[in-house]
Amino acid sequence: MKIAFIIYHEVLDDRVTATLNGLNIDYFTEWENVKGKGHKTDAHFGTRPFPGYNCVRMIAFPEEPILQQLIYKIYELNEGIEKEDDKIRLFQMPLERIV
């Protein structure tokens, strides 16, 4: 089992939602208006100097093939995003148990 966190700029929410729907991934926890800054990326703090927010979706994957399909789709989405700072990030980790 794996768990993945998808982190992306709020303007990409429709694209991420469509991607998840296309893969029949209808199970996730979402955080909106997330403030943050990645390594060598612009900050998103929801302020005038640092506009915008991020969104985070946490998804547990009992089966790894579905996660691999999502990773492939994120690579595809990122090809269409010019600015490196705006690319979608996915962090994958082992998941030991779901209770």
What are these regions (language model features)?
Residues 1-99:
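Positively charged, small/polar-rich N-terminal and surface patches that mediate targeting and assembly
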